UniProtKB/Swiss-Prot annotation:
Pfam families: Trm112p (PF03966). It comes from the Bacteria. HAMAP family: UPF0434. GO terms for cellular component: cytosol. This is UPF0434 protein RL4569.
């Protein structure tokens, strides 16, 4: 994966929230996803763009 596309600007993380829980997101570099611990969802990042659709999110296993 392109190193430039596998990073998320910390300022972006300050602005984005989970569309379901409205909670903060964290970046999972291994899976290239934005994670909402509160909603237990992971939103994919494709071509450097976060896909903030619940229909595209992956449920986190316990």
């Amino acid at each position: 994966m392109d190193e430039k596309l596998s990073r998320v600007d910390p300022k972006l993380l300050d602005l984005l929230v989970c569309p379901l829980s409205k909670g903060r997101l964290s970046y999972d570099r291994e899976h290239n996803e934005l994670v909402s611990e509160k909603a237990r969802l992971a939103y994919p990042i494709r071509d450097g763009i976060p896909i903030m659709l619940m229909s595209e999110a992956r449920r986190l296993d316990d």
